[in-house]
Amino acid sequence: MSHLLTMSELSEVEISEILKDAEDFANGKESKTTEQTFVANLFFENSTRTRFSFEVAEKRLGLDVLNFSADASSVQKGETLYDTIRTLESIGTKAVVIRHEQDRYFDELKDQVNIPILNAGDGCGNHPTQCLLDLLTIKQEFGRFEGLKIAIVGDVRHSRVARSNAEALTKLGATIYFASPEEWKDEDNTFGTYKPLDELVPEVDVMMLLRVQHERHDHYETDIMKEYHEKHGLTVEREKRMKEGSIIMHPAPVNRDVEIASELVECERSRIFKQMENGVYVRMAVLKRALPNVLGGMKHELFV
């Protein structure tokens, strides 16, 4: 069964095939089911980009979308996530997309349910589809991963994006650096080396900024965020020192003038909105992988 839970479960060849399918969709290839197929989106945390991106992807593939509201469901009555998924499975749902605040919520589910789970983010753990859309964006820009230098900057400890990207990009041959306030370092993430931000600015090919996750911190004050921007954010002055041809990425939502100066969000180097566009194509590709009997399957030459 084609769950997509973490990047570590994907081989280089599988990553390549997903990216090639996504690239085909980006280039206008169509793939629609001719039979009624239900897919459920279960979001237990707030989301704009991931939720709507999945919904657009599902509808482009001709799937029937069930949008689950936790507040209006039997979860409020104490129903377990397992029972919720089994209920959806019993009434004919063929796959579930889940975002959940619990790290690795899927560990006890993956061998108990009979439909694919697509992880749309688990707590501070993993975010595989965000990683895949980031990989697609980098691939489109540079044509390769091998030899690239990539800085992942900010709240590394609480970031599922940092965890997924560092692991996958290392597997694909890139060199990963982290820049972070001391209290937000993740010593368990062994896929990169910590260096001061100002040393990395002129060296790296990709500046991947992370959102300051104020919902996971006790203190979120304007003066603290101003200090963060000056010490750890991509200021206009830092952007001027970036190497020629390098790009800026951010998983969004963006805290303007915190992680990045507002005027840089749509600057020439920025690929932030391109990432969002690519999110639809990548999610079409992972849905296609999860539902091969409905949407068919394609094999490709290695794309990495």
Swiss-Prot record:
GO terms for cellular component: cytosol. It catalyses: carbamoyl phosphate + L-aspartate = N-carbamoyl-L-aspartate + phosphate + H(+). Keywords: Pyrimidine biosynthesis, Transferase. Pfam families: OTCace, OTCace_N. Pathway: Pyrimidine metabolism; UMP biosynthesis via de novo pathway; (S)-dihydroorotate from bicarbonate: step 2/3. The keyword Transferase applies. Gene3D superfamilies: Aspartate/ornithine carbamoyltransferase (3.40.50.1370). The keyword Repressor does not apply. One of its GO terms (molecular function) is aspartate carbamoyltransferase activity. Carbamoyl phosphate binds at R49, T50, R99, H127, Q130, A252, P253. Its EC number is 2.1.3.2. Catalyzes the condensation of carbamoyl phosphate and aspartate to form carbamoyl aspartate and inorganic phosphate, the committed step in the de novo pyrimidine nucleotide biosynthesis pathway. Heterododecamer (2C3:3R2) of six catalytic PyrB chains organized as two trimers (C3), and six regulatory PyrI chains organized as three dimers (R2). This is Aspartate carbamoyltransferase catalytic subunit. The lineage of its organism: Bacteria, Bacillati, Bacillota, Bacilli, Bacillales.
